[in-house]
Amino acid sequence: MKMPERFEFPEGATPIDDCSGLIPVWVHHLHDLNRVEAENILNAQRKYLQGRVGDPQTWFQVKELKVIHQAMFGNVWEWAGVYRKSITSIGINPSLIPTQLAELCLEVSSWSEYPVELTFVEMAARVHHRLVFIHPFENGNGRFSRLIADRFLLAFRCQHPLWPSQLNQEGVVRKDYIKTLKSADKSDYTPLVDFMKKLGATDPSLSELIKSSFYRTHISGEKGLAIVKALLRSGSSPNDQTSNGHRALQLSVKAGFEEIVKLLVTFDADVDTKDKSGLTPFQIAVMQENKVVADFFLSKGAKQQPPPGIGYEKYYKLYRE
């Protein structure tokens, strides 16, 4: 059966010049191609974006990324999950794809082990852009990159963007999106991060990050300090509190995150405000019998007020003996 010679694609998309890999023989028009691809992608989204998503270290690997692309387009294109061999207007030289993709996987894996001053949304934006920049496959790289960025955010229990269908069509939305990617080409990720946030991408709040046992392994030591710095830099309040009134500062004292405590105070967290516990940060430090942190609060102007009840005995032990 005669195959279509060429489809028309929106600005910034990689045109498909060779349709010989098209599997559904009845597809001759772009709207038919869009439909069968959308059905295939929806099935992949159900598989990879629903349910629990593991730490990126367990799945952000070259082999798995190729499997995901194959799952997205394997019912439509024979080249799904196979590295691009052609020179395209977007993307690196095909000979560099294996090395560049492997390096990206190593970098993403390192984010789970070493401190990097990026929020989770900022990390996802870099993942998205780098995959688009590498352009590993013959086509579908934008949609693939967005799904991977979404999966990355879900791994950290963050809300991913609700990407509009207009991204696949000529128009203002797509033009704005392409502009953010071009800014990222110049190492300016702010427009892409803002674009993703506008579409619903969110980081955990500071209080949620510190309180939730899920994030405990992510905020220990220097790694946690870097993430908190990134959240504060991106506009999170040092006086943030949970929906039921537990403040990030008090939660940090309770959890023993001394460096995060100091960082929050450096960013002007209030040292005398009581939270849901009914205690000030100084009083919680006393209850923890942590004189180092208690003295730190005093050095920052906190009121030296003993905790009520049995807390007075601990205060007496620390400051009266």
Please tell me what each predicted stretch does.
Residues 229-237, 262-270, 296-303:
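Ankyrin repeat domain, specifically the short helix-to-loop turn at the C-terminus of the second helix
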Residues 218-220, 253, 286:
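Specific position within ankyrin or ankyrin-like helical repeats
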Residues 227, 259-260, 292-293:
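Conserved ankyrin/ankyrin-like repeat signature
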Residues 242, 275, 308-309:
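Ankyrin repeat boundary/linker residues
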Residues 1-215, 226-230, 277:
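FIC/Doc superfamily catalytic core
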